[in-house]
From Swiss-Prot:
InterPro entries recorded: TLDc_dom (IPR006571)
Protein origin, superkingdom: Eukaryota
Protein name: Restriction of telomere capping protein 5
Pfam families: TLD (PF07534)
Stretches that traverse the bilayer: none
TLDc domain residues: 353-571
Keyword match Ion transport: no
UniProt signal peptide: none
Basic and acidic residues compositional bias, start-end: 154-163
Classification of source organism: Eukaryota, Fungi, Dikarya, Ascomycota, Pezizomycotina
Similarity annotation: Belongs to the RTC5 family.
């Protein structure tokens, strides 16, 4: 498994360099307490064969709580997929020639560091990008020395290690490598280069990269990737200290149908019609980096479970035996009932018909929490019900009362049927818009003209039947008063990502699509029009990688009959102890505004506009009612924007 004379010139073999890197990872990327827990988790479960301690696929799946083929009661079967990924990553930075690796403690140290992105303390020049490593761990890349058969002695030694190791080699058939005209970018190997530079072993990398250059010309099988996607969707809300079975123990038929639907929607983004033999690296890199930046975040919290051992109780005396502690702990864990998973949705005036758990997981793969660079489920944010056509009716008056009084970011979701007149075939579609800035009432001059920072950009997206994400435009030139992120008018309805015409007394003009994506909802909240273009950088939203890669320059237009329209407010977790001033909470501010409006309405009842009032009193009363929006229609007061 070594690299011959070329490595001997450097004075170190790949095995020795891999050992040194694992030691540096262990000492610099974990705290002493984390490393103690890690060692206890590993060595208390490891198989010992001829002095080599390692984990099999069964041990890995059982510890993480990941269903595999032995769990007949669970429809998920992601254990073998995770095992092949871990076996590949365990050979880092020589995964081209040494993968699949035996899961020794050193290999598992590298796996946890890579999947939890802790390598920055050692690999300072490395770009925080795991896309290429993750692709290699899922694709069939011929990992034993450019197609040469494995050593017979090695087969004899590993014969009894794991019956599932054979499934790792043959159970995930991926089509033969194909040339995708992909131009290799040296920057994509930053992780490997940084690792070997830290070990003064660049010559080893040059040899290793020549051995198997087809590693990134291979493809990921759709079946393998679907199994991983379904697991990621199920465990997306998982925290570092939660048991995985909390999310996998109650996968009934309805829940699994929803999970499969979300997984198929994500798979559709990779344009499988043009590459039926699997997912190429170019497609994988473009979609994951540009459209699903948080897709693999659940693996971070999953593998952080290795850094907490239930066997260790630091309050106990050192005289206690380890076996007794393990047995007692295992018995307590098995007897303790699993609590229900917490929901990101807060109770309120309605329950969502769109936001099922699998849809929320899908959202967390590309939406970040406001002002933080973590996904929606990791940023301590909650969704408060603000408006729903099911609960509040299809009325712009009700929309205005509930949405324009909400002083925080919102998430707008729409579900409906695509009509026959659309460019795409008929079927159900789910769209949405992420709007970090709150809606504002008043003339267009009140809409923000300054550019948004990178963490407060809006986005327009499609959840199903095909994942589509149009990110917010960072260019200062597109943030104009007549092109707000979202606009509301009692005359024309709701416009997202559109150009708003100037007000006119004689003629009513409709908002027009602008840039790469727009959504227009009519004043009755019964129909909508969705525009998606592969070109156009002059609007609020940029082209989606899923649309751009199709090669067409035509703008697709979809007419939609709306079933349900929902608006959810973004608020911090109310249970957060750092929230000491409830007046800054959007929920409290909205209630205070409603109370004020109720008091003003009560006060207006005493006004008599017909009898006993002079001209000045009449004008004052009329001004009050116009200000409240109850009568009159002053120019510029019929709309609101963001």
């Amino acid at each position: 498994m070594g690299l011959g004379q070329s490595t001997e010139q450097a004075g170190h073999s790949p095995e020795q360099l891999s050992h040194v890197l694992a030691e540096r990872f262990a000492t610099k990327c974990f705290t002493p307490l984390e490393l103690t827990h890690f060692k206890d988790n590993f060595f208390s479960r490891a198989i010992d064969q001829e002095g080599i301690k390692y984990w099999s696929e069964k041990i890995l799946s059982d510890f993480l709580g990941i269903p595999d083929s032995s769990d007949s009661h669970c429809p998920l079967d992601a254990g073998p997929v995770l095992f092949r990924m871990v076996s590949y990553l365990g050979a880092f930075p020589f995964q081209n020639t040494m993968a699949p690796s035996v899961l020794t403690f050193e290999a598992m140290v590298k796996v946890v560091v890579l999947l939890t992105e802790r390598y920055g303390k050692v690999l300072r020049r490395a770009r925080r990008d795991r896309v290429k490593l993750l692709f290699g761990s899922l694709a069939d890349v011929g990992r034993r020395g450019a197609g040469q058969p494995p050593d017979e002695n090695a087969d004899n030694k590993e014969e009894d290690k794991s019956s599932t190791a054979k499934s790792h080699a043959t159970g995930f058939a991926v089509d033969d490598p194909a040339n995708d005209n992909y131009e290799d970018d040296e920057d994509d190997d930053d992780l490997v280069l940084a690792a070997l530079e830290s070990l003064d072993a660049i010559d080893v990398f040059k040899h290793d990269s020549r051995v198997d250059k087809t590693v990134y010309e291979a493809r990921i099988s759709v079946a393998t990737f679907r199994r991983l996607l379904m697991l990621l969707i199920v465990i997306a809300p998982l925290s570092s200290l939660e048991p995985v079975k909390k999310y996998t123990s109650d996968l009934n038929e309805e829940r699994m149908d929803n999970v499969r639907q979300e997984a198929d929607s994500i798979l559709a983004a990779f344009d499988l019609n043009k590459s039926a033999d699997g997912i190429s690296f170019q497609s994988f890199s473009e979609i994951v980096s540009g459209s699903l930046p948080y897709l693999f975040d659940p693996l971070t919290t999953l593998f952080e479970h290795l850094l907490f051992s239930k066997n260790l109780d630091l309050s106990q005396k050192r005289g206690g035996t380890e076996t007794t502690i393990v047995a007692d702990t295992a018995e307590e864990v098995s007897e303790s009932p699993l609590s229900s998973p917490s929901s990101i949705m807060l109770p309120g005036s309605f329950e969502s018909t769109i936001l099922k758990p699998s849809a929320i997981s899908h959202l967390s793969f590309f939406l970040s929490s406001p002002a933080t660079d973590v996904n929606l489920l990791r940023g301590n944010m909650r969704l408060h019900p603000v408006f729903s056509t099911v609960a509040h009716g299809s009325s712009l008056t009700s929309f205005s009362h509930n949405v324009l009084t909400w002083n925080s970011g919102t998430l707008l979701l729409l579900e409906g049927a695509v009509t026959e007149s659309s460019d795409r075939g008929v079927g159900t579609i789910t769209l949405g818009a992420y709007l970090p800035q709150h809606w504002k009432s008043g003339p267009l001059a009140h809409s923000p003209s300054r550019p948004f920072d990178s963490l407060s950009l809006p986005c327009l997206f499609e959840l199903s039947p095909k994942h589509l994400l149009m990110q917010g435009n960072t260019s200062p030139s597109v943030h104009k008063p007549n092109a707000p992120s979202a606009y509301f008018s009692t005359n024309t309805g709701i416009a997202i990502g559109c150009q708003i015409p100037p007000p006119s007394r004689s003629q009513q003009f409709e908002p027009t699509p602008l840039g790469a994506g727009s959504l227009i909802i009519d004043a009755s909240l019964e129909s909508a029009t969705f525009y998606a273009s592969p070109i156009g950088h002059n609007g609020v939203f940029l082209p989606s990688p899923s649309v751009s890669k199709n090669g067409s320059e035509t703008t697709s237009k979809m007419q939609i009959d709306i079933y349900t329209l929902e608006v959810w407010g973004l608020v911090p977790d109310p249970s957060d102890e750092t929230l000491t001033e409830p007046g800054h909470n959007a929920i409290e501010r909205q209630r205070a505004r409603w109370d004020f409006e109720a008091r003003e309405a009560e006060r207006r009842r005493s006004l008599n506009l017909k009898a006993g009032a002079g001209d000045s009193a009449m004008e004052g009363a009329r001004w009050l009612l116009e200000t409240a929006g109850l009568i009159g229609d002053r120019p510029g007061r019929s709309g609101g924007s963001m």
